[in-house]
Amino acid sequence: MHDPVEISRAFLLEGDVDYRVAQILRGTEFHSRTIAFTQQAVEKLVKACLALRGVVTLEHNLSSLFRALYQADFTDMELLVQHVDALERHGARPRFPLFQRRDLPMWVPSRDYGEADAARAYESAEYVWKRLKPYLDEILATYPEVRTERGKARP
């Protein structure tokens, strides 16, 4: 497995891309995609934090694990976890139609999510982003950058 610091940097970079895409989509008619990208951005920030504590996982619902490992680091942990959990609860709904149960109407994310849903998701992501991104930047700045095979420094 790769170095946990490099894994953290990779998650931070990819989370940054997702967050910037969410910023572009915010306020457009693409509500489901705004939610999907905010959700992905926050998941990657949480995974960046977890990697720094030696935890690398493919799981998606990480708010409880994050709380357990970082409780002492954030005085607003309850609020942080509420925002992370709010995004985790969407699951795959922003990206895929749900049609398994005939007794329920088919869920079509691009049709069924609204502007208010996207705004709430963005607000949650923004809160988490403003708390975790500076934390990660500060911690990762204490580690030397590793050169890739192409000779470029990783952020």
Annotate the PLM regions:
Residues 1-155:
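Terminal alpha-helical segments
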